[in-house]
Amino acid sequence: MKILIDENMPYAAELFSELGEVIAKSGRTLTADDLIDVDALMIRSVTKVNSELLSKANKLSFVGTATAGMDHVNQALLKNKGVFFTAAPGCNKVGVAEYVLSCVMVLAQQHGFSIFDKTFGIIGAGQVGSYLAQCLDALSIPYLLNDPIKEQEGDTRSFVSLDELLEKSDVISLHTPITRDGNFPTHHLIGQERLLTLRHDQILINAARGPVVDNDALKNRLLIQDGFKAVLDVFEFEPEVDIALLPLLSFATPHIAGYGLEGKARGTTMIFNSFCEFLQREERADPQNLLPVAPIPNVTLNQQWDHSTLHNLIQLVYDVRKDDAVFRKEISTIGAFDNMRKDYWDRREYSAITITGNKDCGLTPLKQLGFTIEEV
């Protein structure tokens, strides 16, 4: 059995080699010829699964994407061909939420405001948006939710309209898929008209899909230079990036918000376990068994944590300025966007750090935020 994997999928080679012959290739440059005699295909979001790619897939029976998003896969086509499909919903939710928190924490430090004085607006209440809301709940930070599809489906959470969210939120965080059809398309959801309504003191963060925000309109909005801030982890035409947009952004990164090592391990193991079930094999993988010890695995608190402590803990795990600096330095070189993703460092999640302290340190919110807690 031949299993074709994306060469940038962590732990995939060692796991899938238990099941068959593994062939590793660049996901963005896969061609139809690569799928000849291949039984299973394991991809990431850079691979477009369409009729062209599958035109010579004479043995393909299984496709797995180690990503939460699925807009790069023509699922109807796979179904018509009798090919089983699976994804990894929620695998990156922790990393994306921690990315957003890092961005806002750094901006708070740079511009002299407190994250606790802000209201967040979360657009898209799926796995990622819901986890971000959970983090904000842990810190008692208010937020508004917008997700008309969830609302129509009977989700009992309190939702507001998009226009109300844009009006009342200080930090607007996007967590929708990219859709062009249906009652609530998200392509250019944040376009020129809505961008011009945003206040000078608002922050827009897109860690969802690039085309959810009209990048040309965003550039024009930022050129007003009234204090409005924007952070992009995704770009409308990535891997191509509008270089003229970069100086206007507070932070810019190459689609790595969900690239924590834990998240990537979860994505790989989720599709590995699904493939084992498909094959009726007993093998199962636990992402925790794959992860190395964090560079700084332990932190001790001697007193009640405060805003400064929280800022330091969050930046200890992940400081967005590191990725932003690399992005701005490298992006003008050929292939930089994909190379930065391919060579991305082993970023960890809060759970990789154990915080030790006594009951007077008030550790419960930190535990709810995701840190591992050891009370003494």
From Swiss-Prot:
One of its GO terms (molecular function) is glyoxylate reductase (NADPH) activity. Coiled coil: none annotated. One of its GO terms (cellular component) is cytosol. Keywords: Cytoplasm, NAD, Oxidoreductase, Pyridoxine biosynthesis. CDD domains: ErythrP_dh (cd12158). InterPro entries: D-isomer_2-hydroxyacid_DH, D-isomer_2_OHA_DH_cat_dom, D-isomer_DH_CS, D-isomer_DH_NAD-bd, Erythronate-4-P_DHase, Erythronate-4-P_DHase_dimer, NAD(P)-bd_dom_sf, PdxB_dimer_sf. The keyword Transcription does not apply. Its EC number is 1.1.1.290. It comes from the Bacteria. One of its GO terms (biological process) is pyridoxine biosynthetic process. It catalyses: 4-phospho-D-erythronate + NAD(+) = (R)-3-hydroxy-2-oxo-4-phosphooxybutanoate + NADH + H(+). It is found in: Cytoplasm. Transmembrane segments: none annotated. Substrate binds at residues 45, 67, 259. NAD(+) binds at residues 127-128, 147, 176, 233, 258. The active site is at 209, 238, 255 (proton donor). Belongs to the D-isomer specific 2-hydroxyacid dehydrogenase family. PdxB subfamily. Homodimer. Catalyzes the oxidation of erythronate-4-phosphate to 3-hydroxy-2-oxo-4-phosphonooxybutanoate. PANTHER family: 2-HYDROXYACID DEHYDROGENASE YGL185C-RELATED (PTHR10996:SF178), 2-HYDROXYACID DEHYDROGENASE-RELATED (PTHR10996). This is Erythronate-4-phosphate dehydrogenase. It comes from Aliivibrio salmonicida (strain LFI1238) (Vibrio salmonicida (strain LFI1238)). The gene is pdxB.
